[in-house]
């Protein structure tokens, strides 16, 4: 009985917050598609001089508004292939999948401009590591924080133009054979532009 009471309370709270979001005249869901430039910090703690390339990637995110001001955003992309270089020469590649979950605060009442800030967590899965013909490898995952600032500019009732900047903290230990050489901190800044649809 106690569990049923808790479940009912949670459902009631979700319904109430969704109703608050809808009371603003906008639906609680926002889906965006962005082109994002990934700019690696490349803070190499191994002393080897490793660098990971920058690139532009596709990104999709889904936001749910609990109130007109408070939302949660899930940021997704497809696995990305990166090149690792040493002394300017490529030594191999790896793939990473870096979804992030952020809690956002959206500012309202600014004559059509809708800035927001966010903070949350990133989980990066690292796969398909091929460095020095198998002589080196990386940790297979990373947990870290994520920070965000952005702005939506409404184009009509549903569509909006979006500008977004995120700082994501990603690191991986580097191994030569079984010896840990230290951490490579990628810590990229992601600068994105795209379109959003609110419903």
What are these regions (language model features)?
Residues 1-27:
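Cleavable N-terminal export/targeting peptides
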Residues 4, 25-29, 68-70, 111-115, ...:
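Outer-envelope beta-barrel architecture signal
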Residues 21-63, 72, 127-128, 194-196:
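Short glycine/proline- and aromatic-enriched beta-strand/turn motifs that initiate or cap beta-hairpins
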Residues 37, 61-131, 188-199:
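Gram-negative (and chloroplast) outer-membrane scaffold detector with strong preference
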Residues 42-49, 82-90, 127-136, 173-180:
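Outer-membrane beta-barrel translocator domains and adjoining extracellular loop/strand segments
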Residues 52-54, 142-144, 152-154, 158-162, ...:
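Subset of outer-membrane beta-barrel
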Residues 99-103, 118-123, 140-151, 165-167:
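Hydrophobic alpha-helical segments of small multi-pass membrane proteins
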